[in-house]
């Protein structure tokens, strides 16, 4: 019989932190791993898992040789073997400031930039820095990127949602945003270019967002990791342009633009020309949080200036040409699957954000069930919309080779054909109805 006491016969004093379970429950990685476990290893079909959003796994989406050589040179230099300062090394911070300044009226210096272990660490630090008030809440988009939800839950920051409007090209519902805020709201998160919807916000709309943030007295956290994944007609506008209206914390990384999510190097930039963040103690809180967290790889920090400054335009042009081809192919193939509908062709990112009509399917009640059965029966892993805050939507990653995309949509079509509700011909339906009536009498 197990002895649950310690050596003195007393009860052990420790137990697991349930806050981690609560936060992980809304984390995207946990859902992806859960879906992987539903894969049928006896199916004979290799799993096609495009939905984690990693085009870097595809031969058509390889990073730039300039970036690879910069990392190799940094590793060989002997200058990247020590610890880095908590905010990041000056040359990396200066390079990020210069990289962002080309589009900003109020120029950044290296003192305004902090280097992080990818954008996810930047999210964690910013949210932790704003969570001092136990009554504080944060406004997050619906649909949105679930790492914000997970970190807010972990930091005991109340989450309030505002909607993105599909009928208005996924613009922010500003009236709904204002209604969700109160005197304890500290920030709103803006994702532009948008994951998962694939839209790019206009100058006028971003200006209205800044005016609303000023009215509410909140900081805008602007997630701009997809700024180099824009292939539509609308240009990307950085939120920092409007920092004179309301303070903006810009989050970015090289993960998506350079196709290297595994390198884990990103940044936070304080667009604060009126020193509002500094006066409120937010800058100090961010620096304190950085002192408590591991520093990003010094090799990547040493390489960052060359990556940002020397990557040729041709690299981005080639990548965007490949993405446009993937979008067109996927958008057309989707038309063969009646239960899935994409309301707007994406202009950015590497996803189709697709509405699911479960009324056309047998024994599938919602998006989660659709995705779980799809991976079990056809070995295709998609992300259910519920993971991103939207019921009966599905996110399909399209950043892969054309042959793989064709196979993905072939399998989804097979799945649809298997589960589609069959409509009986009128003559047969009438015959069955009359036959049933005769049996009842």
List each language-model region with its residue ranges.
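Eukaryotic N-terminal low-complexity, Ser/Thr- and Lys/Arg-rich leader segments
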Residues: 1-27, 420-441
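Helix C-cap/helix->beta junction micro-motif
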Residues: 155, 215-216, 246, 378, ...
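Conserved glycine-rich beta-strand-loop-beta hairpin in the small C-terminal domain of fold type I
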Residues: 305, 320-331, 342-359
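Conserved core segment of the aminotransferase class I/II
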Residues: 4-5, 69-70, 241-324, 328-336, ...
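Conserved core of the PLP fold type I
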Residues: 72, 76-212, 228-242, 249, ...
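Generic structural signal for small/hydrophobic residues in well-ordered secondary structure
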Residues: 50, 71, 96, 113, ...
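PLP-dependent enzyme catalytic core of the Aspartate aminotransferase-like
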Residues: 98, 102, 363-364, 369-382, ...
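N-terminal small-domain helix-loop-helix segment of the aminotransferase-like
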Residues: 8-118, 125, 176, 295, ...
């Amino acid at each position: 019989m197990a002895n649950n006491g310690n050596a003195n016969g007393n009860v052990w004093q420790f137990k697991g932190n349930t806050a981690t379970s609560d936060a992980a429950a809304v984390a995207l990685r946990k859902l992806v791993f859960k879906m992987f476990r539903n894969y049928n290893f006896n199916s004979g079909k290799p799993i096609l898992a495009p939905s984690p959003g990693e085009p870097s796994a595809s031969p058509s989406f390889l990073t730039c040789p300039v970036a690879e050589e910069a990392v190799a040179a940094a590793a060989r230099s002997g200058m990247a073997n020590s610890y880095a300062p908590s905010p990041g090394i000056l040359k990396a911070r200066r390079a990020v400031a210069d990289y962002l300044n080309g589009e900003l009226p109020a120029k950044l210096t290296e003192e305004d930039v902090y280097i992080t272990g990818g954008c996810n660490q930047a999210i964690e630090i910013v949210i932790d820095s704003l969570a001092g008030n136990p009554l504080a809440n944060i406004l997050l988009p619906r649909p949105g990127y679930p790492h914000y939800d997970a970190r807010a839950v972990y930091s005991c920051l109340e989450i309030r949602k505002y909607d993105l409007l599909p009928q208005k090209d996924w613009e922010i519902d500003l009236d709904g945003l204002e209604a969700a805020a109160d005197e304890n709201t500290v920030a709103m998160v803006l994702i532009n270019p948008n994951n998962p919807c694939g839209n790019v916000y206009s100058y006028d709309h971003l200006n209205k967002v800044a005016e609303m943030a000023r009215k509410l007295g909140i900081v805008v956290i602007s997630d701009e990791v997809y700024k180099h994944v824009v292939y539509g007609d609308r240009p990307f506008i950085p939120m920092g342009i409007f920092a004179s209206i309301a303070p903006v914390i810009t989050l970015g990384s090289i993960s998506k633009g350079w196709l290297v999510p595994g390198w884990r190097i990103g940044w936070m930039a304080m667009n604060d020309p009126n020193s509002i963040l500094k006066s409120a103690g937010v800058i100090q809180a961010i620096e304190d949080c950085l002192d408590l967290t591991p520093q990003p790889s010094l090799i990547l920090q040493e390489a960052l200036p060359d990556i940002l400054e020397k990557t040729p335009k041709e690299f981005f042009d080639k990548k965007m040409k490949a993405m446009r081809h993937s979008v067109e192919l996927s958008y057309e193939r989707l038309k063969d699957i009646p239960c899935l509908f994409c309301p707007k062709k994406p202009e950015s990112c590497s996803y189709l954000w697709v509405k699911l009509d479960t009324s056309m399917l047998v024994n599938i009640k919602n998006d989660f069930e659709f995705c779980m059965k799809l991976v079990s029966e056809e070995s295709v892993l998609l992300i259910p919309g519920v993971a991103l805050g939207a019921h009966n939507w599905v996110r399909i990653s399209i950043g892969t080779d054309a042959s793989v995309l064709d196979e993905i949509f072939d399998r989804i079509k097979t799945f649809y054909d298997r589960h589609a509700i069959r409509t009986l011909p009128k003559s047969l339906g009438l015959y069955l109805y009359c036959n049933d009536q005769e049996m009842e009498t």
